Amino acid sequence: MQNKPIPFHISNVNHGLAEVQGLIHIKKNHLILEFEIKDALGGFIKSDLKEIDIPFDEIESLTYKKGLWGASVKIEGNSMRTFEQIPESEQGRCELKIKRKDRNEAEKSISSARVALSEYKLNKLEE
């Protein structure tokens, strides 16, 4: 499964002093979150690029919600460790915001990722 990467952001990191900008890559049996943290004041100070591989085994659910100004992708993991490296994640869940201009492409990609996740879980049950 090769979908176009989905741009995302997480605002109000470190009490509004930083924000996360990144891409969601949807692969056959896993998601890859690639991101960097920037200061919110000018974006001049950046962290190193981080990449987190999340196997479908560690994902409980994947949802997409369209809003008036954008959308959000919510990923729920099987463990708190699944998203421990992602800022603002808590209790094994993370929410990634999608800008309005990217939401239609994101909706298609997340829909196909949900199908792939369901098929993966069904195949695991049959084993």
Which functions belong to the PLM regions below?
Residues 1-5, 11-23, 44-127:
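Acidic, Ser/Thr- and proline-rich intrinsically disordered linker/docking segments
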Residues 20-36:
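Polybasic phosphoinositide-binding surfaces of eukaryotic membrane-targeting domains
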Residues 36-38, 59:
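Histidine- and/or cysteine-centered catalytic micro-motif in compact active-site loops
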